[in-house]
A protein has these predicted regions:
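Gly/Gly-Pro-rich "capping" loops immediately C-terminal to redox-active cysteine motifs
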Residues: 34, 49-76
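Extracytoplasmic
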Residues: 39, 56, 70-73, 83, ...
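Electrostatic cytochrome c docking/interface patches
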Residues: 21-36
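An amphipathic alpha-helix signature
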Residues: 72-80, 97-100, 104
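Bacterial N-terminal signal peptides that target proteins for export
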Residues: 2-13
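C-terminal capping alpha-helices of c-type cytochrome domains
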Residues: 90-110
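The canonical Cys-X-X-Cys-His
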Residues: 38-48, 99
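Bacterial N-terminal signal peptides
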Residues: 11-22
């Protein structure tokens, strides 16, 4: 006799598996991340090479991308639950991945 798991259990297992995948496993869009950065982040962070001024007490995107231990996944997860000094941007997982991918571009020669 073959036992078939109910569809609801299969769906739950699939959802749990998907939740454990890295946020950036899907194809992120750095150009979308740049738009989000200019909208949400530029008040405090230097988010582009053409930006001349921001809050002096926060790291630039270049400094974040070049910091030891930087990873797209760590930044994406952080953006979903930011620290108290950051606004709650209510980003989707895809938006967080896009923004993390954009930040990562500062770790390479631009």
């Amino acid at each position: 006799m073959i036992c078939k798991a109910p569809r609801s259990i299969t769906s739950i297992v699939a959802a749990l598996f998907a939740a454990t995948l890295p946020l950036t496993a899907t194809r992120a869009d750095p150009s979308s991340g740049e738009r989000l950065a200019r909208q949400w982040c530029a008040t405090c962070h230097v988010v582009a090479s053409d930006q001349k001024q921001a809050d002096a007490d926060v790291p630039t995107f270049a400094a974040i991308a070049k910091s030891p231990g930087f990873s797209r996944d760590k930044i994406a997860y952080f953006l979903l639950d930011p620290h108290p000094k950051m606004p709650n941007m209510s980003l989707t997982r895809a938006e967080a991945a896009d923004l993390a991918d954009y930040i990562a571009t500062f770790g390479t020669t631009r």
